[in-house]
């Protein structure tokens, strides 16, 4: 299980990303439309003044049960070893174990 502080940090990043999403998107569109370089630098400076954690690249997918950051299946939102345990316990409908 991941430390609670890491999970809270990730939630804080998600909230910041949602808050600044429209601002960042509109700034990027402005940069592509403005022809002069000096205006682009001004808009870029405004974009750089937004919080670092508001960038979507700072987000990381985590298992919603354990908070584990690696080996996540997007469809289930679970990490690999939790997914395997749940499939073996028949807790995920429609998921079957592979056997050959």
Swiss-Prot record:
Biological role: Binds 16S rRNA, required for the assembly of 30S particles.
Subunit description? Part of the 30S ribosomal subunit.
Highest taxon of source? Eukaryota
Q: Which Pfam families match?
A: Ribosomal_S14 (PF00253)
Tell me which positions the record assigns to the signal sequence.
none
- What cellular component terms from Gene Ontology apply here? chloroplast; small ribosomal subunit
- Keyword terms, alphabetized: Chloroplast, Plastid, Ribonucleoprotein, Ribosomal protein, RNA-binding, rRNA-binding
Q: Which SUPFAM superfamilies does the record associate with it?
A: Glucocorticoid receptor-like (DNA-binding domain)
This chain belongs to which protein, by name? Small ribosomal subunit protein uS14c
> Where found?
Plastid, Chloroplast
Q: Which GO terms describe its molecular function?
A: rRNA binding; structural constituent of ribosome
An example of a Gene Ontology BP annotation on this entry? translation
Q: Which gene encodes it?
A: rps14
* InterPro entries in alphabetical order: Ribosomal_uS14 (IPR001209), Ribosomal_uS14_bac/plastid (IPR023036), Ribosomal_uS14_CS (IPR018271)
* Subcellular location, principal: plastid
Q: Which family does it belong to?
A: Belongs to the universal ribosomal protein uS14 family.
């Amino acid at each position: 299980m991941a430390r609670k502080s890491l999970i809270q940090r990730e939630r804080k990043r998600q909230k910041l990303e949602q808050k600044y999403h429209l601002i960042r998107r509109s700034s990027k569109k402005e940069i592509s439309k403005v022809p002069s370089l000096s205006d682009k630098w001004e808009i870029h400076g405004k974009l750089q003044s937004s919080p670092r954690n508001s960038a979507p690249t700072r987000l990381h997918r985590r298992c919603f049960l354990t908070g584990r950051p690696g080996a996540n299946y997007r469809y289930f939102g679970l990490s690999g070893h939790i997914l395997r345990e749940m499939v073996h316990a028949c807790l995920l409908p429609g998921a079957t174990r592979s056997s050959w």
